[in-house]
Amino acid sequence: MINVEYKHTQVAAKKKLGQNFLTDRNITRKTVLLSGAKPDDQVVEIGPGFGALTRELVEECHNLTVIEKDPTLATFIRNEYPQIKVIEGDVLTINFSAMAQAGKPLQILGNIPYSITSPILFHLLEHRRAFRSATLMMQHEVALRLAAKPATKEYGILAVQMQAFCKVEYLFKVSRKVFKPQPKVESAVIKLTPHATDPALDADGFRRFVRIAFHQRRKTLLNNLKESYNLELVDSNKLQLRAEALSIEELLELFSLIKTKSE
């Protein structure tokens, strides 16, 4: 562990919590600006740490809630910013839908832990009707996978599941040199904006279909899907392709033509 001290509060940066603290204020200002958060929005920050992003949000937003798992950091934020609400707990247990008051969607921001980036993204996907946008800093490699296009090595389950239900924007890259302790990898900021309507009536069924279609990337769609689905309505030529060759629209169309073998 590396000890990090700020304003007489010292924490041992915990690798299991993915704690890397941002030190460049230009990055936090840019993140808040591109998030589009307005003064009257209900804003939620994930993982404030020592408050690098919190400081900018407090200046811009009147209704801010932060979620912090580390007790020492949660206490620090309470003392430093007594005007905001602090939820001390695991973001993966947070019911964002319940937080969206009177049907007013949240604006979510955060420098999310590398160690649980994918679980956080899928948790947000479950609560996509609760937020207007989520502007998140994450590992650069994951950001590339999120924004990936078909027929690339990065294109897979994460890209398809997130892009099917949200507009995904890669905003900018962040050097590892602006963090303490310095991580081994670069970061990036992305923005997720949920689509107004879901592209598939059975959203959970589509997400399961995507996992099966990409389960073994080197196999054709036919080989990946035949055990789980009735494929008689699907063009046989298309079934000879790999999932990575199909756009999200094509995967949605394919999903509309198949039925699970239990149906």
UniProtKB/Swiss-Prot annotation:
Annotated family: Belongs to the class I-like SAM-binding methyltransferase superfamily. rRNA adenine N(6)-methyltransferase family. RsmA subfamily.
Compartments, record wording: Cytoplasm
Subcellular location, principal: cytoplasm
EC number: 2.1.1.182
Keywords, alphabetical: Cytoplasm, Methyltransferase, RNA-binding, rRNA processing, S-adenosyl-L-methionine, Transferase
Residues that coordinate or bind S-adenosyl-L-methionine: 20, 22, 47, 68, 90, 111
Gene: rsmA
Protein name: Ribosomal RNA small subunit methyltransferase A
Described function: Specifically dimethylates two adjacent adenosines (A1518 and A1519) in the loop of a conserved hairpin near the 3'-end of 16S rRNA in the 30S particle. May play a critical role in biogenesis of 30S subunits.
PROSITE patterns per UniProt: RRNA_A_DIMETH, SAM_RNA_A_N6_MT
Natural source organism: Chlorobium chlorochromatii (strain CaD3)
UniProt catalytic activity: adenosine(1518)/adenosine(1519) in 16S rRNA + 4 S-adenosyl-L-methionine = N(6)-dimethyladenosine(1518)/N(6)-dimethyladenosine(1519) in 16S rRNA + 4 S-adenosyl-L-homocysteine + 4 H(+)
InterPro entries for this protein: KsgA/Erm (IPR001737), rRNA_Ade_diMease-like_C (IPR023165), rRNA_Ade_Mease_Trfase_CS (IPR020596), rRNA_Ade_methylase_Trfase_N (IPR020598), rRNA_adenine_dimethylase (IPR011530), SAM-dependent_MTases_sf (IPR029063)
One Pfam family it belongs to: RrnaAD
Superkingdom of this protein's organism: Bacteria
Entry's Gene Ontology molecular function annotations: 16S rRNA (adenine(1518)-N(6)/adenine(1519)-N(6))-dimethyltransferase activity; RNA binding
Catalytic class of the enzyme: transferase
Gene Ontology terms: cellular component: cytosol
Keyword RNA-binding: yes
NCBIfam families: ksgA (TIGR00755)
